[in-house]
UniProtKB/Swiss-Prot annotation:
Pathway: Lipid metabolism; malonyl-CoA biosynthesis; malonyl-CoA from acetyl-CoA: step 1/1. Its EC number is 2.1.3.15. The gene is accA. This is Acetyl-coenzyme A carboxylase carboxyl transferase subunit alpha. The lineage of its organism: Bacteria, Pseudomonadati, Pseudomonadota, Gammaproteobacteria, Enterobacterales. It is an enzyme of class 2 (transferase). Residues 35-296 form the CoA carboxyltransferase C-terminal domain.
């Protein structure tokens, strides 16, 4: 399977191409007197070393590219790898079922939880059906319906954030996009069950915040969280999207910086090369973090849970 190497990964791609070429030669002519195994292993070791070197010094713009990687695991991938017995729930009971938001009941280590997350698409048809992970108001109203259901049945809520932003179309605005986002922000702050939010890819503006108010907010190592995309910021400040790398650095969109500012709680390490290189490994790391967060929140009474969430929200800007 092609890993869809990004521009800054091209030296790695060239090494991997050499490895594939040598392996292909070995398969085509098994009678070769030359043993290629040692050379293949040498190149593999070199590839790992090069990958480690490149990924040890990534800039914010490179991380933004990784956050958008077409093979990066999406919400439904984590549902399969982390949870069991998932039963998807659909519709906002008012207008439509927005496929850019998925949600339903599942089990985390036999414990019922409510899962809600953005869902992008892989192939063209699915991308269109999912609206490229940009929810309309009915998506956020569906999310709120599921949150209220979780509260009614005393189930923890686990959200996965991965969107370039809420859909800015005319129809979405006519149906109350800003109201839907604002209502979610208000209602999530008062939910009487644990809420754990994790940014797994792009955390774009209000579209991310609408399912991002929680007791714990985590980010994967190569995810981003920002009020606007680097391209959008560059277009406003420098009148050119070409300045996106400069904007990404200035905006502080990466996980370590956001943890330093106390806007998030934990950074979940990704496998070498990014989450798409080993979906099962990142699934295991995510599961461990979710279980640890739930264990911490389970020690609180409902009053303590709400008070701690309130204090957490009010502390923003005082890092």
């Amino acid at each position: 399977m092609s890993l869809n190497y990004l521009d800054f990964e091209q030296p790695i791609a060239e090494l991997e191409a050499k490895i594939d070429s040598l392996k292909s030669v070995g398969r085509q002519d098994e009678k070769l007197d030359i043993n290629l195994d040692e050379e293949v292993q040498r190149l593999r070791d070199k590839s790992v070393e090069l990958t480690r070197k490149i990924f040890s010094d990534l800039g914010a713009w490179q991380i933004a590219q990784l956050a958008r990687h077409p093979l990066r695991p999406y919400t439904l991938d984590y549902v399969r790898n982390v949870f069991t017995d998932f039963d998807e729930l659909a519709g906002d009971r008012a207008y439509a079922d927005d496929k850019a938001i998925v949600g339903g009941i599942a089990r985390l280590e036999d414990r019922p939880v409510m899962i809600i997350g953005h869902q992008k698409g892989r192939e063209t048809k699915e991308k269109i059906r999912r609206n490229f992970g940009m929810p309309a108001p009915e998506g956020y109203r569906k999310a709120l319906r599921l949150m209220e259901m979780a509260e009614r049945f005393n189930m923890p809520i686990i959200t996965f954030i991965d969107t370039p932003g809420a859909y800015p179309g005319v129809g979405a605005e006519e149906r109350g996009q800003s109201e839907a986002i604002a209502r979610n922000l208000r209602e999530m702050s008062g939910l009487k069950v644990p809420v754990i939010c994790t940014v797994i890819g792009e955390g774009g503006s209000g579209g991310a915040l609408a399912i991002g108010v929680g007791d714990k907010v985590n980010m994967l190592q190569y995810s981003t969280y920002s009020v606007i995309s680097p391209e959008g910021c560059a277009s406003i400040l420098w009148k050119s999207a070409d300045k996106a790398p400069l904007a990404a650095e200035a905006m502080g969109i990466i996980a370590p910086r956001l943890k330093e500012l106390k806007l998030i709680d934990s950074v979940i390490p990704e496998p070498l090369g990014g989450a798409h290189r080993d979906p099962l490994a990142i699934g295991a790391s995510l599961k461990a973090q979710l279980l640890a967060d739930l264990a911490d929140l389970d020690t609180l009474t409902k009053a303590e849970l709400l008070d701690r969430r309130y204090q957490r929200l009010m502390s923003y800007g005082y890092a």
